[in-house]
Amino acid sequence: MKKIVNFALDSDVMTGGIKLNNNFLVSTDYINGAVLRAGFANMILLECPFYDEEINNRKYIVAYRGERCGDCNKVEVCKKFSDMYFSFLFPKDTKYSPLTMKSCKAYGTEHPVKDIIASDNMTPKSNFMCHECASANGRIENMKGLINVKSYKQHKVERSISTHTAINYNTRTIKDSSLFQIDAIKKGQIYSGIIDDMDSGLLVEGLTIYVGKYS
């Protein structure tokens, strides 16, 4: 059964994103479903005594290992893990603005937004105008990024920039040319998504899941 699951970020999260140059990494505003699955897999494997055994020439995978699993409380989880569904995580009550969503060019979401396809008035002229903005001749533009699904206001993900370096463990000094910065999702926010754990008991309130890197 699919369930809506909320995640409270207890630390900054760096996941996916782009490398603007050799020393500046930027996280995406969302958390990929594959990254979330890997976080749950890591949690399971940390409790498994057979985590490094090969199955089909692969190591470190969640899989049912027959009678050796014995009375482990994760048996049903391991049996069904490959069939489970993990959606992307977005800030709670948000989604990406559809391509047909428009907002006032001058005042943004302070004025009512409109969908040019779902609009009640489908005449081309009125459909591409903000009717509350005479001072800007009613011009509208594409909405971009995340929007709150309740208020239709644009949602800005809080970010955190931190500086990191690599250590040479032989000399216990900083490696040359190893200083870099991370632009990550800031801790303290609530992210939400859909997970189908196949009624295996995987989802338990209060679990700590580690996702992303450098955080």
Residues covered by each model-derived region:
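Conserved active-site/ligand-binding neighborhood in enzyme cores
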Residues: 1-215
